[in-house]
Amino acid sequence: MRILYVGSVYFSRVMLEKLIDLNAHIVGVITKKESAFNTDFEDLAPLAQSNNIPYRYVRDINEGMTIGWIEELRPDIIFCFGWSFLLKKEIL
């Protein structure tokens, strides 16, 4: 199963680590570079990078370039943990 992972808080990192430990097929990670909104903010890019998983920093997950990248990844499922914005139907 091809997994796209979306998150930017502590719980997001913990769950991503668990999926990596289980050798899940993670095809991409979407995270934020910074967040003043979340006190438990976590940048998932270093974890993705150290495990050779493609990643993207986004401000607006629903913008065209991000949707295009998601389509290229062809995920079977999206795991979204700790993301403070709604995903539009084009992503789902």
Spans of model-derived segments:
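One-carbon transfer enzymes
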Residues: 1-92
